[in-house]
Amino acid sequence: MSMQDPISDMLTRIRNGQAANKVAVKMPSSKLKVAIAALLKAEGYIADFAVEGEVKAELEITLKYFQAKPVIEQIKRVSRPGLRVYKKKDELPSVMGGLGVAVVSTSKGLMSDRAARKAGLGGEIICYVA
């Protein structure tokens, strides 16, 4: 069976891994998944990530905990294959009053909502992380 939404699958694996107190989660790799993982690491939501293998590359994300609780309290897919969500630069959402991050796909690549606002770019809202 083919996977319809690989990004939702990635977010669900992260959510389930943290619910089960796993150290790391593995999933099939893609350029978009690696870019999302890099953004989550830069924002401090995951400890690390690595791509393993050449032909069937796997993305391994090392989860981050603080005082035995997951750092990511909420991770939610916004734009999905059946309903894409695009926002202009002045319509970009602020997640949890600025405490969370909206992952935005812009013409200059993936970036956080703050970086997109600063660069004056809008785009597709991939997910919210808080």
From Swiss-Prot:
> Which keywords describe this protein according to UniProt?
Ribonucleoprotein, Ribosomal protein, RNA-binding, rRNA-binding
The organism's place on the tree of life at top rank: Bacteria
Per its UniProt record, what InterPro entries does this chain match? Ribosomal_uS8, Ribosomal_uS8_CS, Ribosomal_uS8_sf
Q: Which GO terms describe its biological process?
A: translation
Show the GO MF annotations: rRNA binding; structural constituent of ribosome
Pfam families from the entry? Ribosomal_S8
GO CC aspect terms: ribonucleoprotein complex; ribosome
Q: Could you describe the subunit structure of this protein? A: Part of the 30S ribosomal subunit. Contacts proteins S5 and S12.
The record's similarity note reads: Belongs to the universal ribosomal protein uS8 family.
Question: What is this protein for, i.e. what is its function?
Answer: One of the primary rRNA binding proteins, it binds directly to 16S rRNA central domain where it helps coordinate assembly of the platform of the 30S subunit.
What is this protein's record name? Small ribosomal subunit protein uS8
Q: Which organism is it from?
A: Vibrio cholerae serotype O1 (strain ATCC 39541 / Classical Ogawa 395 / O395)
| Lineage, uppermost ranks | Bacteria, Pseudomonadati, Pseudomonadota, Gammaproteobacteria, Vibrionales
